[in-house]
Every structure is written in C-alpha cells, then in structure tokens.
Amino acid sequence: YWSDRITAAGMIGIVTSTTGPVVAPHGGYRAVLGTNPLTIGAPSAGDHALTADLATSAGAFGKVLAARNAGESIPEGWAVGPDGEPTTDPATAIAGSLATFGGHKGSAIAVLVEVIAASLTDARYANDTVDIWSNPGSRMNTGHVVIAIDPASFIGAEQTATQVHRMQEAVRGSGAPGSVFAPGDPEFANATASAERVFLADTTCASLDALFDRLGLPRPVALDA
C-alpha cells in the first residue's frame, strides 16, 4: 500500500516491516525471525510501477495458512517442523518454522530488514514480540520503516521513469515472449482481473459462512464464476 502511494507520487519507495517469530535463520530450526517483508517500487514511464513485494521467508506465511485451510501441501524447502526436519505439511510448518529464501543470503537479508525496521523505530525484534492472538488487547510492537526517494533530487523524475521502463522491457525481452515477467507484472495482472470480483477457495467461503451465521448476519452472496 505505502509503496504504491509513493510510486503514484512519482517517487521510489522502500518499505520494510517486522512480524512475529515464524522464521528460522539459515541452518537453524527455532523461529526467531519474522517473515520481514520488503517492498521496493519505482515509477515507470507509460507502464505500471516496477514493484517487488516479497517476504524474506521462502514462502509467505499467509500462503502456508491458505494451504492448511485448503488441505493442501506446501512446496519442499519452505519449512521445517519443531524437530528441525523438512516438512511439506502446513500444520507442521506452523508448529515449526519457515525457512528464509535463498539460503544464507536470504537469511542475512531477513536479519538486516529486521534490524532496520525494529532498531530504527524502537520496536521489538520478532523473538521479543507479544503473541496478540494469545494475549488479545496487547501491543505486538512491530516496526515499520517507510522511505521515499525523490528522483528530482538526482537525475530527475522523467528520466528516472524512462530508465525504469527500459529495465522492465529488457527483463520481459530476455526470453520467449510472455515467459519472463518484470517485478510487479503478475501482481498488476491479478489486480486488473480482481477489480470486480475476488475468487475464494471453497474452504474460505465455508469459514465466512460460519462466521456470518455465528454473528447472525446474512451470508455474503457469491457471484457466478
């Protein structure tokens, strides 16, 4: 959200955040790091912004929860169980820890993102946060750092946006047509397709129905696919 706001204003955005402890450093199995998402976005001339929005874990924690709710497995290499053994079972992964992406390099990035987002804001590191699900009303005290870089202070907004677009085209043209995507391409396509409707898994719909029933509210009406 904040990265999109920044790029819409013609600036380059860098956003980092911390979370609760769900990720183990490379070589470990105890969850002491957060998924520590990192977003970098840059406006592009005549195109959508070039934006990378990623968790520093091998897979986003939300995707692990979605796999559990759908009764599906997660990819190999995403997580280990409490015993440190690799697992593709999302429930075991939640009880254990997620892996960082990219081995020791991703692990280093995860640590540095946490240092930036927590240390500069006097927030807690993931391992020191309060579990708000077990302690409702408590403050988790995660940290967030939002940086906006104005290209006008460098080579100028127009020239920067043109350079960014050149990079997008170079990436897209590096393989067979339609087979290589620049950062942000899949998300832009998905946002366009979801502008009027959002597709939900049957298990998610069932959970929503149960919630609305419990609250005594009319169930949401599903649109035809």
Model region roles, listed by residue range:
Residues 11-22, 116-132:
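Glycine-rich phosphate/pyrophosphate-binding loops
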Residues 14-17, 41-43, 52-55, 148, ...:
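Short beta-strand segments
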